[in-house]
Amino acid sequence: MDFRNAKELLKVCQEQGLSISALMLQRELTEGEQDPEETDRKMDRVLEIMKSAASTPIHTPVKSMGGLIGGEAKKISDHKDTGKGLCGDLLERAVIYAMATLETNASMGVIVASPTAGSAGIVPGLLLALQETYDLSDEQIKQGLYNASAIGYLAMRNATVAGAVGGCQAEVGIASAMAASATVELMGGSPEQSLAAASTVLMNMLGLVCDPVGGLVEYPCQNRNAAGVANATIAAEIALSGVRQLIPFDEMLEAVYTVGKRLPAELRETALGGCATTPSACAACHMCD
């Protein structure tokens, strides 16, 4: 059982009364030719790695290989503990976990590319925060991961998730869309609302360039993962409220791909423009003339 785009995905969900996560699981079992127990074990492992990557730096901060980040998640966690946080419990937790995951990645730790290493904090950041805030089970979070993977699959099939091809809008943008869609389903929303949230996310991040300082997946990547969970939360809230999304996900994904291909090479992961070529960034990485 396969689907080529969101329109087909939605049609199958409606005809068979399936959630996006249930349909994606069926696809995994048929197209991937894996037995249910093996598939479940693999998803258990994915969730285990996500939890470790999102929590370890909070308790044991480690400097990144490039030296540009390290300890940020703990600082935000400590600030949250003072009761002076601005974002509310859910978003504060999501930001902490997202930034911690990027610290794990940048210090050669094990992460789950979701869909890429540079955007690996967004999906686990928001889903783990939801789990703690709403007392969700691991099985429910795995359901969210199947939903998120459906959005990622469509993006990889019909566009790109690579910053080198489509800019940060394709990398952090798609990860944020995955998280938003999963959040909507976990909060009781429909497949239509999940896709609306994913479309809203991409609209909000359209045109974002990929400009890693020193060519490293550290800065501004970590901060953009934090922005990604905020974007996903906002988009999910909008969709769950019943606000209409004018542009379908398939069309929004095509727009992301078109804009990405029009970005100059300097703004697609080459570190030759944007944040990467500011004087302070050059001084920090000791790489620019």
Annotate the PLM regions.
Residues 1-109, 133, 242, 249-289:
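Generic N-terminal targeting/processing segments that precede catalytic cores or assembly contacts
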Residues 86, 113-120, 132, 136-137, ...:
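Glycine- and small hydrophobic-enriched segments that form the cores of compact globular domains
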Residues 88-105, 140-159, 203-212:
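Acidic-glycine-rich active-site phosphate/pyrophosphate-binding loop
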Residues 108-111, 161-167, 219:
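Active-site-adjacent structural elements in folded domains
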Residues 108-126, 170-175:
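Conserved phosphate/anionic-ligand binding catalytic regions in large, soluble enzymes, centered on
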Residues 124-135, 180-188:
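Alpha-helical support elements that line or immediately flank enzyme active sites
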Residues 145, 151-164, 168-178, 183, ...:
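Glycine- and acidic-residue-rich phosphate-binding/metal-coordinating active-site segment common to enzymes
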Residues 183-289:
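Functionally critical mobile loop/hinge segments
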